[in-house]
Regions:
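N-terminal Rossmann-like NAD(P) cofactor-binding subdomain of oxidoreductases
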Residues: 1-175
Length: 175
């Protein structure tokens, strides 16, 4: 979906289709809906090499991978917009408890900006790391924020009861 959105943006040019699983395979062979739209091959996701070539790197990786790759050299050259949860949570202990993995870049958590533009637009513009919000949180925050901002609800009593199909949060169907 990210590729489709970027391809339709007048100011975006995709330079690199990174993948660890599909290196040297045509992107459209992996993602058939891109047949006759994308003629590029997937390349290894060497972020240090890529940082010299682009203004922004989008990562759409499993939890933990972006945090294990990001470093000061990369961030000195480009911005990162991370679609995983690696920089969404400001408490490393909560992240590690929830995802059952050690956070590999806790030094960047405080500077990462939660990328909900409706609330953090100015911070997103200047951030080196943008933590792309997930679907549940976006829905929940955009629903409650205007009411909370005006003091119309008590946040300590707020309950969000949300449901998902089998593909929610990147999960597949399994028993």
């Amino acid at each position: 979906e990210l590729v489709r959105i970027l391809m339709g943006h007048k100011d975006a040019e995709i330079k690199w289709y990174g993948s660890r699983s599909y290196v040297d395979q045509k992107y459209a062979d992996v993602y058939r809906n891109m047949f006759q739209i994308v003629d590029a091959k997937c390349m290894d996701d060497n972020m240090e090499e890529l940082a010299d070539q682009v203004d922004v790197i989008f990562t759409a990786t499993p939890q933990g991978l972006c945090a294990s790759l990001v470093n000061e050299e990369i961030l000195s050259k480009t911005k990162i917009i991370d679609l995983s949860a690696d920089f969404r949570l400001k408490d490393v202990n909560v992240y590690e408890e929830w995802y059952k993995i050690e956070h590999k870049a806790p030094q960047y958590i405080d500077e990462a900006v939660y990328g909900l533009c409706e609330i953090n637009r100015d911070l997103v513009k200047s951030a080196r790391i943008v933590a792309n919000p997930g679907c549940y949180t976006t829905c929940s925050i955009l629903t409650a924020y205007p009411l909370a901002k005006e003091g119309l609800i008590d946040m300590s009593t707020l309950i969000i009861d949300a449901k998902s199909g089998t593909s929610g949060a990147g999960r597949g169907a399994k028993l």
